[in-house]
C-alpha cells in the first residue's frame, strides 16, 4: 500500500515533468521540467511574502505600514499613538528639528519690521515683512489698485506700483508706495521715452512715495520687451504713464538711462538725490 501511495503522488508529477519537457512554448519549462513552475508560483506569492515577511514598517510608497496602520486605527476609533519613542531614524539627513537653547534670544517684538536704508539715506523706511508685490495699473483696474492700497494703509505695509507708474488710484488712501521704474520710465519720461528728471522729482518727493525700485529688465519678456496693446491704452492709463492714448505701449528690453553696472550705480545715486532720500 505504501508503494501505491508513492506512485499516486509521483506519477502525476512525472507526467507534468514529461509534458513540460516535450512542449515547445516555454523554454524555461523545457529546460527545467516541473521545477520551473515554482517560478510562477512565487511570482504570485511575491506581494504577500514582501508585505508580511520582507517589508519593514517604514517601507512602502506612497504610504508605509505605519501610515496605513494609523488610518486603520482611526477608522475604528482606536488609539493611533505609538508609545516609547519612534522607529524612524530622526538623525538622518531627511529630518530637521529645532533645538532648545540654554541661552535663548530676546522675544520677537509684536510688530516685527525691517529697516531699509544705510547711513547715506536721509529717508530710511521701516518695512513690514509681508507687502504687496508689483502689479501695474493697466494690468489691474482702478478699483483693484485702490483696494490694495487701502489694505496697505490698514496693514501698515507697502504697496509696489509695478512698472505702470503711480496713478491717482494709488493716491486715494495714502498707503505707503514703492514706485517701480522700468525701462519705459512710465510717469517720468519725455516724448521720446527717455528718463525725465523733472517729472521724476515731482512724483518721487511726495510723502506717500517711500522707496524707489529699479526694474533692471523685462524678466519673462526678454529680447523684445513688453507691449501693452493700444486698444488697452485708455485715457487714464495714458495720463498715468505719460504715453499717447490708443497707441501700443512698449517697455524696451533694456534701459536707456544706463548701459553698464557703474552707470547703473551712478543713476541710482542720482535718483536718490532727485527724490531727496
Located regions from the model:
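Non-cysteine beta-strand/loop elements that form the S-adenosyl-L-methionine
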Residues: 211-217, 235-245
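Conserved, well-structured core domains of diverse proteins
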Residues: 1-158, 164-174, 179-223, 229
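Short beta-strand/loop segments at the ligand-binding rim of alpha/beta enzyme cores
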Residues: 176-179, 272-277
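Generic structural signal for well-ordered alpha-helices
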Residues: 149, 200-201, 261-269
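Active-site beta->alpha loop and helix N-cap motifs at the rims of alpha/beta catalytic domains
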Residues: 218-220, 243-264
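Cytosolic nucleotide-binding catalytic cores of signal-transduction proteins
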Residues: 232
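Gly-rich Lys/Arg/Thr-decorated short loops/hinges at beta-loop-alpha junctions or inter-strand turns
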Residues: 126-131, 238-253, 273-276
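Hydrophobic, Leu/Ile/Phe/Ala-enriched alpha-helical segments that form helix-helix packing faces
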Residues: 152, 268-275
Amino acid at each position: 500500500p505504501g508503494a501505491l501511495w508513492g506512485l499516486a503522488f509521483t506519477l502525476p508529477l512525472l507526467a507534468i515533468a514529461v509534458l513540460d519537457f516535450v512542449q515547445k512554448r516555454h523554454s524555461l519549462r523545457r529546460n527545467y521540467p516541473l521545477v520551473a513552475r515554482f517560478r510562477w508560483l512565487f511570482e504570485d506569492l511575491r506581494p504577500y511574502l514582501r508585505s508580511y515577511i520582507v517589508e519593514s514598517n517604514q517601507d512602502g510608497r506612497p504610504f508605509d505600514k505605519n501610515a496605513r496602520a494609523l488610518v486603520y486605527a482611526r477608522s475604528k476609533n482606536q488609539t493611533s499613538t505609538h508609545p516609547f519613542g519612534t522607529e524612524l531614524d530622526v538623525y538622518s539627513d531627511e529630518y530637521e528639528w529645532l533645538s532648545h537653547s540654554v541661552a535663548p534670544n530676546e522675544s520677537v517684538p509684536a510688530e516685527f519690521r525691517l529697516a531699509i536704508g544705510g547711513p547715506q539715506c536721509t529717508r530710511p523706511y521701516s518695512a513690514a515683512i509681508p507687502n504687496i508685490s508689483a502689479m501695474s495699473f493697466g494690468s489691474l483696474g482702478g478699483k483693484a489698485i485702490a483696494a490694495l492700497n487701502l489694505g496697505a494703509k490698514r496693514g501698515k505695509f507697502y504697496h509696489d506700483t509695478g512698472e505702470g507708474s503711480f496713478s491717482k488710484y494709488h493716491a486715494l488712501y495714502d498707503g505707503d508706495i514703492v514706485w517701480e521704474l522700468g525701462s519705459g520710465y512710465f510717469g517720468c519720461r519725455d516724448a521720446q521715452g527717455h528718463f525725465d528728471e523733472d517729472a521724476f522729482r515731482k512724483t518721487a518727493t511726495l510723502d506717500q512715495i517711500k522707496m524707489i525700485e529699479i526694474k533692471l529688465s523685462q524678466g519673462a519678456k526678454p529680447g523684445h520687451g513688453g507691449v501693452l496693446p493700444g486698444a488697452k491704452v485708455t485715457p487714464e492709463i495714458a495720463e498715468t504713464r505719460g504715453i499717447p492714448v490708443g497707441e501700443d505701449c512698449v517697455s524696451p528690453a533694456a534701459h536707456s538711462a544706463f548701459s553698464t553696472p557703474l552707470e547703473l550705480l551712478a543713476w541710482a545715486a542720482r535718483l536718490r538725490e532727485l527724490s531727496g532720500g
